[in-house]
């Protein structure tokens, strides 16, 4: 029994370990990996390894693993990575697992600066990555510093700007708050939709020379072949869509591309090593096949996958809506509870105030009763005094009469009697005046007593009203709203060729009509422009890279990925090949 071989496969978010037999093929290992991770969109992916010479290479699926130049380690090391990239992520990436693997791979490439990303776009992408990781922003949970341990921006961007970690976090958080309600998988898709508009996204670069010996870059991607000057990987100068290419072949280091246009000459370039030509051929075949497949009706399998993905997404949206509904109900219930508690406190306070008013009113009533009693006593005294004075007046009158009588009877003592009469007359006048004064006082006291009695009756009535009044009604309750394998060829083979068929394909070059994601969204476009201006104030100009300079020139000239694509494909194939030869 042959001894099994240990294999470790690292995906973007997991490490898988297998034991394989010495006769296990690359396809058998690949199938085991995709089955383990639950992936059905296998045509984008491959297994990458480092060979004995230190070069990164794709595992050939039609050969045994042991017959390939995998670096001898225990276990054997492989990376499960996207080998081919879609033209439009939102149209082509169906399964959530596929979307997540692409998201993680592209994010890593941007953070490592393998894909150039301008600073303001890096902040926007970081906010989608944060939404994908943390969900909706919640200030109760996401306290300042919640992003301190996350790697969210390329080191280049951090070093170029005089901003603290807190200032970067604030800018990312502002956008994170705007993504409220966005599902995590939708956040990954939004990230990819922005990232796919970056010039270096999905491009495999190879060093080549034309017949003149000029050092250039060949870019192989989902849309075709592009030629770049050696100091500019952002802006291709000449482009050939896959629909213009009939045959690709190489002989040793010479690579020949035959256009569909029979009048056009062959497109010839030279690679520094044979293995580079093998890899270019494999990538051309794979990308061309996917380019043509996209321009034909979906297979039954893809239709089924899309239907299943739609159903799963719909189910998730329903579940999320249900969760949101329950959350809202909880929030409404909590608010109702708070309202009731608040009303209870308000009623208790009102009751306390009523009790205080009652005690105060009782005290006032007692005081007014006391005053009324005093006034009554004063009135009584004044009345008695008036009666006494009246009695004295009558007695004086009687005495006057008696004296007058005596005076009449006793004329002989007239002087004495006259004096006594005058005395009594004066006394009577004084008594009359005193009586009148006392009567006025009695009248005044009587008025005061009546007023006090009225105050007493009014206070009794108010107390009665306060004691009998019902508590204020509560406010009305709130009613809630309701690979096909593309062999890089045997290492000993110094030549290979592949015919690229374009039969049955409609609308070959639809990609030339595309616009970037930010051009579609005016609000995001303005926010990016504002952030770009803001970051420019904090930028250290001495730390600008060549790509920063090139990007700034493109922005100034109004160029983007798709405008450049249309421009570099202008003219016929012959004109573009002549242009390439002249570089």
Swiss-Prot record:
Residues 376-400, 437-447, 455-464, 506-525, 537-555 have a biased composition (Basic and acidic residues). Phosphorylated by tyrosine-protein kinases. Phosphorylation by ROCK2 suppresses the head-to-tail association of the N-terminal and C-terminal halves resulting in an opened conformation which is capable of actin and membrane-binding. A head-to-tail association, of the N-terminal and C-terminal halves results in a closed conformation (inactive form) which is incapable of actin or membrane-binding. The modification Phosphothreonine is found at residue 564. Gene3D superfamilies: 1.20.5.450, 1.20.80.10, 6.10.360.10, Phosphatidylinositol 3-kinase Catalytic Subunit, Chain A, domain 1 (3.10.20.90), Pleckstrin-homology domain (PH domain)/Phosphotyrosine-binding domain (PTB) (2.30.29.30). Keywords: Actin capping, Actin-binding, Cell membrane, Cell projection, Cytoplasm, Cytoskeleton, Membrane, Phosphoprotein. The modification N6-succinyllysine is found at residue 83. The keyword Manganese does not apply. GO terms for biological process: apical protein localization; barbed-end actin filament capping; cellular response to platelet-derived growth factor stimulus; cellular response to thyroid hormone stimulus; establishment of endothelial barrier; establishment of protein localization; establishment of protein localization to plasma membrane; microvillus assembly. Pfam families: ERM_C, ERM_helical, FERM_C, FERM_M, FERM_N. Residues 310-333, 376-407, 437-530, 536-555 are annotated as: Disordered. It is a peripheral membrane protein. It comes from the Eukaryota. GO terms for cellular component: adherens junction; apical part of cell; apical plasma membrane; cell tip; cleavage furrow; cortical actin cytoskeleton; cytosol; filopodium. CDD domains: FERM_B-lobe, FERM_C_ERM, FERM_F1_ERM. GO terms for molecular function: actin binding; ATPase binding; protein domain specific binding; protein kinase A binding. A 1,2-diacyl-sn-glycero-3-phospho-(1D-myo-inositol) binds at residues 60-63, 278. Residues 5-295 form the FERM domain. Residues 494-503 have a biased composition (Low complexity). Residues 469-480 have a biased composition (Pro residues). It is found in: Cell membrane; Cytoplasm, Cytoskeleton; Cleavage furrow; Cell projection, Microvillus. Probably plays a crucial role in the binding of the barbed end of actin filaments to the plasma membrane. The N-terminal domain interacts with the C-terminal domain of LAYN. An interdomain interaction between its N-terminal and C-terminal domains inhibits its ability to bind LAYN. In the presence of acidic phospholipids, the interdomain interaction is inhibited and this enhances binding to LAYN. Interacts with CPNE1 (via VWFA domain) and CPNE4 (via VWFA domain). Binds NHERF1. Interacts with LAYN. Interacts with NHERF1 and NHERF2. Interacts with MME/NEP. Interacts with ICAM2. Interacts (via FERM domain) with SPN/CD43 cytoplasmic tail. Interacts with CD44. Interacts with CLIC5; may work together in a complex which also includes EZR and MYO6 to stabilize linkages between the plasma membrane and subjacent actin cytoskeleton at the base of stereocilia. This is Radixin.
């Amino acid at each position: 029994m042959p001894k099994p071989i240990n294999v470790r496969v690292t995906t973007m978010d997991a490490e898988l370990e297998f034991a394989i037999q010495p006769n296990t093929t690359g396809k058998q290992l690949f199938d085991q990996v995709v089955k383990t991770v639950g992936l059905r969109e296998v045509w984008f992916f491959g297994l990458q390894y480092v060979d004995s010479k230190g070069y990164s290479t794709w595992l050939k699926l039609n050969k045994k693993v042991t017959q390939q130049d995998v670096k001898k380690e225990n276990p054997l090391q492989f990376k499960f990575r996207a080998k081919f990239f879609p033209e439009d992520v939102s149209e082509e990436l169906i399964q959530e697992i596929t979307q997540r693997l692409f998201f993680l791979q592209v994010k890593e490439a941007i953070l490592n600066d393998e894909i150039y990303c301008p600073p303001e776009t890096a902040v926007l992408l970081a906010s989608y990555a944060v939404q994908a990781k943390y969900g909706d922003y919640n200030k109760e949970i996401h306290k300042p510093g919640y992003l301190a341990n996350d790697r969210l921006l390329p080191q280049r961007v951090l070093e170029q700007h005089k901003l603290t970690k807190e200032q970067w976090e604030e800018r990312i958080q502002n956008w994170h708050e705007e993504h409220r309600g966005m599902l995590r998988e939708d956040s990954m898709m939004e990230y990819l939709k922005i990232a796919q508009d970056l010039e270096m996204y999905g491009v495999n670069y190879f060093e080549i020379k034309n017949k003149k010996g000029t050092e250039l870059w060949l870019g192989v991607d989902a849309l075709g072949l592009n030629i770049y000057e050696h100091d500019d990987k952002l802006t291709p100068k000449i482009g050939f869509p896959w629909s213009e290419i009939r045959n690709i072949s190489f002989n040793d280091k010479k690579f020949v591309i035959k256009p569909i246009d029979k009048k056009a000459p062959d497109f010839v370039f030279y690679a520094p090593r044979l293995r580079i030509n093998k890899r270019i051929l494999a990538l051309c075949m794979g990308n061309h096949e996917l380019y043509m497949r996209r321009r034909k009706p979906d297979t039954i399998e893809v239709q089924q996958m899309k239907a299943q993905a739609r159903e799963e997404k719909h189910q998730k949206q329903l579940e999320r809506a249900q969760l949101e509904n329950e959350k809202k109900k909880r929030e409404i219930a909590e608010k109702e509870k708070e309202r009731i508690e608040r009303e209870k406190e308000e009623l208790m306070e009102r009751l306390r105030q009523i009790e205080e008013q009652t005690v105060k009113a009782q005290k006032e009533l007692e005081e007014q009763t006391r005053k009324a009693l005093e006034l009554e006593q004063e009135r009584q005294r004044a009345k008695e005094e008036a009666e006494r004075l009246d009695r004295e007046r009558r007695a004086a009158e009687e005495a006057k009469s008696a004296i007058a009588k005596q005076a009449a009877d006793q004329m002989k003592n007239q002087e004495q009697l006259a004096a006594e009469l005058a005395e009594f007359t004066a006394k009577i006048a004084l008594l009359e005046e005193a009586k009148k004064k006392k009567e006025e006082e009695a009248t005044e006291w009587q008025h005061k007593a009546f007023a006090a009695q009225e105050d007493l009756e009014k206070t009794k009535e108010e107390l009665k009203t306060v004691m009998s009044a019902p508590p204020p009604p509560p406010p009305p309750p709130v009613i809630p709203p309701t690979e096909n394998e593309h062999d890089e060829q045997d290492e000993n083979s110094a030549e290979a060729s592949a015919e690229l068929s374009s039969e049955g394909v409609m609308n070959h070059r639809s990609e030339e009509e595309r616009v970037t994601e930010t051009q579609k969204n005016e609000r995001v476009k303005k926010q990016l422009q504002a952030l770009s201006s803001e970051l420019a104030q904090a930028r250290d100009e001495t730390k600008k890279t060549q790509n920063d300079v090139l990007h700034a020139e493109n922005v100034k000239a109004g160029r983007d990925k798709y405008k450049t694509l249309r421009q570099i494909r202008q003219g016929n194939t012959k004109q573009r090949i002549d242009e390439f030869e002249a570089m």
